Amino acid sequence: MTTASAAVPASTSLPTGIWLRMYLRLFAVQGSWNYESLLGNGIAFCMEPALRLLPGGMTGQRYSEALGRHARYFNAHPYLAGVAVGALARAELDGVPPAMIERFRTALGGPLGSVGDRLVWASWLPLCSLIALGAFGFGARPILVIAIFLVSYNLGHFWLRAWGLRVGFQKGLRVADALGNPVLRKGPQVVGTAAALIAGAAIPLASSRLIGGGRVFAAEIILLAMVGGVLFARFGGRLEGWRLSLAILALLVLFSVIR
């Protein structure tokens, strides 16, 4: 029996306790961030529970070599770091040659960074903010507005970390297939467009509540947002979210003037 087959469970899944420790450590992946290794130390810290399964355990040579290898420079989006943690842990437990792991590790960081930035910072975060802003515009109390934002945003990245760790370990060196998942490939465009549509209603409603002094035509605002949705469904990928948002806001301003 090879060392790889002795180390990796037959089901290609981690024991529940190890998986849970790795998942919880993902929330501290940026805890040792620095300009020299960026997320490197955090990646090694998150992988460490799985590396204990290597032959010799924590006192073995493969454990110390793997830990040192992954504590070096690495950069990715922190919410998608679980993909790298799972895939690299699987590669180590499978006994993949160190040189191949290094090449794989180098190639993995860039895609995880760019996809994460577009999905989270440019799409999911604005969407959650605008949903909370819309709730404020409809009269929700400030504490409820804060709760709506925190719950919606945190549910998203809690799920993303868990998904990344699971799919990374399942796929191993073939994790590139997972990066073609519709959530990662089309998610930024869909979420970004939804954020643009919600902005057309949330911003005027919230502004009116803050400024006051005039009647709010909530039905008309919602109608314009629905018109934007129809336009997006009609033109699909040819219509960018930010252009649609500007068009809706322009229609709203024009309607307010002629009203």
Regions flagged by a language model, labelled:
Residues 59, 133-147, 204-215, 258-259:
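Helix-coil boundary and interhelical linker segments in multi-pass alpha-helical membrane proteins
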Residues 142-158:
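Alpha-helical transmembrane segments
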Residues 157-165, 181-212:
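Alpha-helical transmembrane segments of helical membrane proteins, especially in multi-pass transport
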Residues 241-259:
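Final/C-terminal transmembrane alpha-helix of multipass membrane proteins
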Residues 103-136, 198-199:
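Transmembrane alpha-helical segments and their cytosolic interface motifs
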Residues 1-97:
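Soluble N-terminal domains of membrane-associated systems
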Residues 96-103, 210-236:
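Hydrophobic alpha-helical transmembrane segments and immediately flanking/interface helices
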Residues 167-183:
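Juxtamembrane inter-helical linkers in multi-pass membrane proteins
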